[in-house]
Regions:
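Flexible interdomain linker/hinge and immediately adjacent N-terminus
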Residues: 1-17, 114-119
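Basic, Lys/Arg- and aromatic-enriched nucleic-acid-binding interface segment
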Residues: 13-42
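The alpha-helix within a helix-turn-helix
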Residues: 35, 46, 167, 179
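Conserved tyrosine-mediated DNA breakage-rejoining catalytic core shared by Y-recombinases
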Residues: 47-91
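Active-site/catalytic core of tyrosine-dependent DNA strand-transfer enzymes
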Residues: 86-141
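Short, basic (Lys/Arg/His-rich) helix/loop patches that form interaction surfaces
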Residues: 129-168
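Catalytic-site neighborhood detector that most strongly recognizes the C-terminal catalytic loop/helix
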Residues: 170, 174-195
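C-terminal secondary-structure termini that scaffold catalytic or DNA-interacting sites
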Residues: 197-214
Length: 214
C-alpha cells in the first residue's frame, strides 16, 4: 500500500449519508453509492462501460482491465471481477442514466462530466477528488474513494463474510492487504487469519519444505 493509504480509516455510514445528502446531482450520488457497495477502486469505477460492464438483469457490475480508457482510468490488476449492487441503488443508477441520457448515449462511459467545457467527456480521477474536497468544505466531513473502499471491507467483515471472499471482492492479491483494510484486530480476525494460513500452508506443503531442510 502507498504510505498515505496505510493509516486511512474506513468511512462511517452516517458520514456517507451526510455526503450523499450534500451532493448537488445524482451522478455524484450514484458514484458514491457504487463505490460503497462494490468496493471497487476509483479507477475501476470510472472505467465502467455502461454498454458492456453492467448486467441489467442481475444488477451486477463487472471490472474489466483495459489500458486504453480515454480518462486513463483502469483496473489495477489484469483480472475480471463482478459485484452486485442493491436493488435500490440499481434503480437509482437507472434513474441517473435516464437523467443524462442525451449526453451518455454519445459515448460508453458510465460516469461523465455533466457541465462545462468538458461536458460529455469521461470523468477523471482528479475530478472525483475535487468533488470530495467540495463536499468536505460543505459538510466538514473528509471522505475519499479509498475510505469508501475500506467501508466496504469493514461492513462485509461485520456481516461475517469470510476473509478470503472480502479479499477477492476487493481485488487484492494478498490476504495481508485485506487485513490492513479492516479497522479491527479482534479474536475473530485472528482466528480467520490463522485458519486461512493453516489451510493454505497445507495446500502448498510448507511444512514439508521446512522438514526437508532440517
Amino acid at each position: 500500500l502507498k504510505e498515505e493509504e496505510r493509516n486511512v480509516r474506513a468511512a462511517e455510514r452516517n458520514e456517507i449519508v451526510t455526503i450523499l445528502e450534500a451532493c448537488t446531482n445524482c451522478r455524484d450520488q450514484v458514484l458514491i453509492l457504487l463505490t460503497s457497495e462494490l468496493g471497487f477502486r476509483i479507477g475501476e469505477i470510472l472505467g465502467i462501460d455502461y454498454t458492456k460492464d453492467i448486467d441489467y438483469e442481475n444488477h451486477e457490475i463487472r471490472v474489466d482491465f483495459r489500458d486504453d480508457n480515454e480518462n486513463d482510468a483502469r483496473a489495477k490488476n489484469a483480472e475480471e471481477r463482478r459485484g452486485r449492487v442493491s436493488d435500490d441503488t440499481f434503480e437509482f443508477l437507472l434513474y441517473y442514466i435516464g437523467e443524462y441520457w442525451d449526453i451518455l448515449q454519445k459515448q460508453e462511459y458510465l460516469f461523465i462530466n455533466i457541465k462545462g467545457d468538458t461536458i460529455g467527456k469521461p470523468l477523471r480521477v482528479d475530478s472525483v477528488y475535487d468533488m470530495f474536497e467540495r463536499m468536505e468544505k460543505k459538510t466538514g466531513i473528509k471522505i475519499t474513494p479509498h475510505m469508501l473502499r475500506r467501508y466496504y471491507a469493514n461492513t462485509r467483515w461485520e456481516a461475517d463474510w469470510p476473509l478470503e471472499m472480502i479479499s477477492q471482492a476487493l481485488g487484492h492479491k494478498h490476504l495481508d492487504t485485506t487485513i490492513r483494510y479492516l479497522n479491527v484486530l479482534d479474536d475473530k480476525l485472528k482466528t480467520a487469519s490463522q485458519e486461512f494460513y493453516r489451510r493454505y500452508s497445507k495446500l502448498y506443503g510448507v511444512e514439508q519444505f521446512l522438514e526437508s531442510r532440517r
